[in-house]
Design a protein with these regions (language model features):
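N-terminal intrinsically disordered/low-complexity leader segments
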Residues: 1-8, 191-193
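Hydrophobic alpha-helical connector segments
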Residues: 60, 74-106
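Helix-turn-helix
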Residues: 14, 22-56, 60
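Amphipathic alpha-helical segments used for helix-helix packing
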Residues: 87-90, 101-129
Length: 193
């Protein structure tokens, strides 16, 4: 019996979703294709009917993961916006929170891959760069900032999360997040004038 129409696309998207969780948690080089396929509940042999190689999967996962992050942050901004807090402040509070730091499999892929991206293929680096630019545009627009200020804000946010995840001292990690939130909000208040 043949598979229903759209089955192959559904399986492909399921693999990308599984890969996004794995790459966010373990990085690209520390995770194998068999592990990704097992996480998706599939056999390794089926991978090549969906992707040419691991690099193609990583590139498509970067696009998916940033889309996922932007959608999540937009929902947070829409839900938490009130008279006392702007949309960008709600996004900063979440992005630089212990929840985002600790739930790596659902978090932003930018800090998750920042330490290894320069050592991956040029195609992957180009995909990461394209998605970083898209994320900067999203944050810059929400903050009402110019592009240079947006570069600084996103660099600060992504770097803070990467460092907060890297350190072994929980209080120090929390302090980094708190300082990052304060700094990011100051940048928004200065940059949006």
């Amino acid at each position: 019996m043949p598979y229903p129409k759209g089955h192959k696309l559904k399986v492909r998207n399921h693999i990308i979703t599984s890969a996004a969780k794995a790459f966010r948690t373990h990085g690209v080089r520390n995770i194998s294709l068999p592990h990704i396929m097992k996480g998706a509940g599939l056999t390794h042999g089926g991978f090549y009917s969906h992707f040419e190689n691991k690099d193609q999967l990583v590139m498509e996962t970067c696009h998916f993961a940033i889309s996922d992050t932007i959608e999540m942050l937009q929902r947070i901004a829409d839900k938490n916006k009130n008279e006392d807090q702007t949309s960008i402040e709600a996004v900063i509070d979440f992005y630089l929170s212990s929840l985002h730091r600790d739930q790596t499999e659902f978090g932003c892929i930018l800090p998750a891959l920042s330490g290894e991206i320069s050592q991956l293929s040029e195609d992957i680096r180009q995909a990461y760069t394209q998605e970083l630019r898209r994320f900067i545009a999203f944050i810059t627009t929400m903050a009402g900032m110019n592009t240079d200020d947006g570069y600084a804000l996103v660099s600060s946010m992504v770097g803070t999360v990467a460092l907060a995840r890297a350190v072994s001292d929980a209080k120090f990690s929390d302090d980094l997040l708190q300082a990052g939130r304060v700094q990011a909000k100051q940048m928004v208040n200065i940059g949006s004038r």
